């Protein structure tokens, strides 16, 4: 079984980038080589701030979407600092099911 990751990068201009991968080290290297996402190409170098692992692609990609579209920057930074991304994402999923 593959591990699927949602990851958060800090770009050189201090902006955040969130993505999905199955190979965290390779993806970070790809970003820093300038061959990653269009957004990060002009904001190098990038550094990994956080990563969350999931057992399946759907959960990891759903977490990426939630992080990008449901949170503002201050919320994102607080979750990163307190290592609570996965916990709060799972709470979001549970609340959505009710």
UniProtKB/Swiss-Prot annotation:
Report the family membership.
Belongs to the UPF0213 family.
Question: What's the source species' lineage?
Answer: Bacteria, Bacillati, Bacillota, Bacilli, Lactobacillales
PANTHER family xrefs: UPF0213 PROTEIN YHBQ
Q: Which SUPFAM superfamilies match?
A: GIY-YIG endonuclease
The record's section on InterPro entries has: GIY-YIG_endonuc, GIY-YIG_endonuc_sf, UPF0213_domain
Q: Name one Pfam family in it.
A: GIY-YIG
Q: Which residues cross the membrane?
A: none
Concerning CDD domains, the annotation shows: GIY-YIG_UPF0213 (cd10456)
Descriptive protein name? UPF0213 protein llmg_2010
Domain of life where this protein originates = Bacteria
Give the originating organism: Lactococcus lactis subsp. cremoris (strain MG1363)
GIY-YIG domain spans which residues?
A: 2-79
Please name the PROSITE patterns in this protein's record: GIY_YIG
């Amino acid at each position: 079984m593959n591990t699927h990751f949602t990851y958060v990068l800090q770009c050189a201009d201090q902006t955040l980038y969130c993505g999905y991968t199955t190979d965290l080290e390779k993806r970070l290297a790809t970003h820093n080589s300038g061959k990653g996402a269009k957004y990060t190409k002009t904001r190098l170098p990038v550094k990994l701030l956080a990563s969350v692992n999931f057992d399946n692609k759907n959960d990891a990609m759903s977490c990426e979407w939630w992080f990008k579209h449901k949170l503002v920057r201050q919320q994102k930074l607080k979750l990163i600092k307190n290592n609570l991304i996965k916990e709060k994402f799972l709470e979001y999923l549970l609340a959505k099911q009710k």
